[in-house]
Amino acid sequence: KTRLEALKAVTGFLARRQENYVVLSDCDGVAHLDLSEILDYHEEKNADITMVTHYEEVEKTSNYMVIGADKEGRVNEVRVNPRIRGKAKADVYINVMVFNRQFLLNLVEDSVAHGDTSFENDIIAKQLNSLKIYRYDFRGYYAGIHSMTTYYKHNMELLDKAVRDELFGARDIYTKVRDSAPSKYGEEATVRNSLIS
């Protein structure tokens, strides 16, 4: 499903909610975001949409959205999967967005009525001038997991104490507990520079 189709499927649920805000987040990124800071920024800017970005190196093989913004943080350019040669640094959207709940419901309803199919292309990119879209620049550690290569790379980064401290040090993180069999190491196994749970 596309993001727009997924949102259309949950409009009934969103309509019954009383919360003022909706935070959309994909599961392919690792960061320790303080959502209260992002929500405060969203309110301060009186934004329709707040997109969280991270300044990072990108490669031509990556699937990503590059965001350009003015000095106030208002998004004025969106490039979906831009063509680049080699590697470049850019403000990359990390698949976290904040909306006012009722605004999101209206946006999805209007988009479906107009036959829009892509949230990024039909809503974000085409409506930059009519919507108040702001960028929240996240400056902490972020790991985008887009391939086996990036999965391995970011797992190796966790061996760095500074990275672990940034992700796990300041605030508690709660996850679903899954009791499963532990790792098993044979008599001839050699393990170095590893974190084992």
Please identify what each model-predicted range represents.
Residues 1, 64-68, 93, 149-154, ...:
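Short, surface-exposed amphipathic charged segments that create phosphate/polyanion-binding patches used
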Residues 1-30, 35-37:
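Conserved N-terminal catalytic core of the sugar/cofactor nucleotidyltransferase
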Residues 9-13, 41, 55, 126:
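A generic secondary-structure signal
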Residues 18, 32-102:
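Conserved core of the sugar-phosphate nucleotidyltransferase
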Residues 23-25, 50-52, 134-136, 143:
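Hydrophobic/aromatic beta-strand patches that form the interior of the parallel beta-sheet core
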Residues 24-32, 93-94, 107-114:
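Flexible, glycine/proline-enriched loop segments at strand-loop-helix junctions
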Residues 28-29, 57-58, 141-142:
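Short histidine/acidic/glycine/proline-rich micro-motifs that form metal-
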Residues 102, 110-197:
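Left-handed beta-helix
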